Amino acid sequence: MSSTENPDSVAAARELEALRAEASALRRQLAESPEQLREMESRVDSLSIRNTKLMDTLKEARQQLIALREEVDRLGQPPSGYGVLLGVHDDQTVDVFTSGRKMRLTCSPNVDAETLKLGQTVRLNEALTIVEAGNFERVGEISTLREVLDDGQRALVVGHADEERIVWLAEPLATVYEDSERESIAYDAESPTRKLRPGDSLLVDTKAGYAFERIPKAEVEDLVLEEVPDVHYDDIGGLGRQIEQIRDAVELPFLHKDLFHEYELRPPKGVLLYGPPGCGKTLIAKAVANSLAKKIAEARGQDSKEAKSYFLNIKGPELLNKFVGETERHIRLIFQRAREKASEGTPVIVFFDEMDSIFRTRGSGVSSDVETTVVPQLLSEIDGVEGLENVIVIGASNREDMIDPAILRPGRLDVKIKIERPDAESAQDIFSKYLVETLPVHSDDIAEFGGDRTACIRVMIERVVDRMYAESEENRFLEVTYANGDKEVLYFKDFNSGAMIQNIVDRAKKYAIKSVLDTGAPGLRVQHLFDSIVDEFSENEDLPNTTNPDDWARISGKKGERIVYIRTLVTGKNASASRAIDTESNTGQYL
């Protein structure tokens, strides 16, 4: 520095230099600030996300702590007891049966004593206070109702060991009984709200002394089918005379009670339909129930569509039970149900199919004498102290000779109608029920009659019947030799039935369907029916196999002299060589 320089100038220069440096620094800071701002914003966002995650974690941990605390509290609770409510008092105390003793307890504030129902299950805390009301008990012992006592709140029941006890009716059962008594309601048998009746099975808690529920008797429900059959007399062919007989026996007494009373004529209590298998015995019984319901509806001025009747179809062999007295009990329950239905003025038909399997002649059993008690039970039901008003018994059997004579005497099964095998005229009537004009018929067959479908089907039926009933070589079936030495040739027509005719028509329809698939030509032909007859006869060739040919002959409708020798005479399609059997020396091979 020169000695001539001014000190003030030097100071000013230095200050200016400092200001320039500061300005430069500010310029650099201003240039860097946007990048720092973005960095700071990014850090803020990151911290915010982290903070949110931490908050969620804390909330989840808090919820887990609360759940764990509740679980600890729940595990630490003392056990609860259960009891059956016996009664409610005005002071909000209740009587409860619990732990084998009757106790008077109080209700917690959360339970309204007035809403509790007798017989209801309640939950008790450690202080024996009612804290919750539950449902009615659903498990227990089954007892049979003997009678409901006059107060309508108690009942006399019988347990398994025939022990009688008085039990309270839980509120649902008591309410049903009171309503039915007050309103005189005839509840339906299947309704859970129908009136209690003797013989009902009840769910009972013998310790608490309460009956909770009516349990359907499955063993009886399986044996009895309540229905209004949709079968008409027009559906039955070839049995006009038998239908008239059963209508006179069943329908007239129901429809003209005043005339029967005027002439002092007692209506029949029962009808026996007997004859070979597959000839329409069950169909007739069902048609009777349907026709009777419609006739009574018309007499009362009701719509025939609303006609009501009951057809109790008893599965005969299943009625038998290995336990002593069970079969008799089932019979009592069946007739009890029939009387209840009939009390409404509705006709009830009790139909015993295969009657010989249940009510065979007493003393004829080989390994069992069950018939010695079952037969008297039926007799007592038919003509016992309790009448069978509006109830008629119909039995069906193909071995009427095995039914106990006491059942068949007048006053029990009064009317006996034989359902015979169809003759040629009856067979035409039966065929007409299955070969109807709505069926597709082959155009060639219709063309033979100038396009007259009705005439074609009529002639088709006549040809088929002629083929079935011709006493020709190809229709021979058996040669039987009787004990007196007489011989007789039996043809397939001697074993025809309505069921066989239906099967022949069904076979022919199947052949017609196969013909459509093979040739494309639709329609039923006479040849289809002829082929079906041959197949049906050939299949029946080997069917009459039994260890007792005389029994088989009786079932098939051939009664009379005892058969001692049988020889087959089948010569149709696929027929094997004739076979013979001497029934005296060999009883287990063919017939």
UniProtKB/Swiss-Prot annotation:
Binding site for ATP: G278, C279, G280, K281, T282, L283
Cellular component GO terms held in the UniProt record: proteasome complex
GO molecular function, one term: ATP hydrolysis activity
Docks into pockets in the proteasome alpha-ring as annotated region, ranges: 590-591
GO biological process: modification-dependent protein catabolic process; proteasomal protein catabolic process
Keyword terms: ATP-binding, Chaperone, Coiled coil, Nucleotide-binding, Proteasome
Protein name in UniProt: Proteasome-associated ATPase
Domain-related comment: Consists of three main regions, an N-terminal coiled-coil domain that binds to protein Pup and functions as a docking station, an interdomain involved in ARC hexamerization, and a C-terminal ATPase domain of the AAA type.
Sequence similarity: Belongs to the AAA ATPase family.
Subunit and interaction comment: Homohexamer. Assembles into a hexameric ring structure that caps the 20S proteasome core. Strongly interacts with the prokaryotic ubiquitin-like protein Pup through a hydrophobic interface; the interacting region of ARC lies in its N-terminal coiled-coil domain. There is one Pup binding site per ARC hexamer ring. Upon ATP-binding, the C-terminus of ARC interacts with the alpha-rings of the proteasome core, possibly by binding to the intersubunit pockets.
UniProt keyword annotation of Chaperone present: yes
Coiled-coil boundaries: 8-77
A Pfam short name: Prot_ATP_ID_OB_C
Function in brief: ATPase which is responsible for recognizing, binding, unfolding and translocation of pupylated proteins into the bacterial 20S proteasome core particle. May be essential for opening the gate of the 20S proteasome via an interaction with its C-terminus, thereby allowing substrate entry and access to the site of proteolysis. Thus, the C-termini of the proteasomal ATPase may function like a 'key in a lock' to induce gate opening and therefore regulate proteolysis.
Pathway: Protein degradation; proteasomal Pup-dependent pathway
